[in-house]
Amino acid sequence: MSAPDNRIAVCPGTYDPITYGHLDVIGRASEMYDTVIVAVVNLPWRKGQTLFTAEERVRFLTNATEPMDNVKVETFSTLVVEFAQQRRAMAIVKGLRAISDFEYEFEMNQLNRMQAPDIEIGRASCRERVFRTV
């Protein structure tokens, strides 16, 4: 786990496309942690299944989060919990769009907790404009 003086959180997602809901969750995480890594999933087998390439999504997110000094954007192609461990993150922060997300996220939380019990997993519901794209 990271040192207490550099609290790192990972905000994983597809971000295809980026929404104001994504930026709301990222912004709130940036207020709570010293460093927030926005982790854009880049799975080669999903090529052609996303609206934008991973490189485009990284560029869009980098531009959208530019005012947040403690946010950086990276791609990943491993399990989220493995990526968080590699970055020495103390937390994984994800958004909840609707109640239907809860069951899936609950199951993922159980699996992640078994693999990395020292990493906190937080869920945040978006305040407004959840599905409106940037």
Where are these predicted regions, by residue range?
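Nucleotidyltransferase catalytic core that binds NTPs
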Residues: 1-132
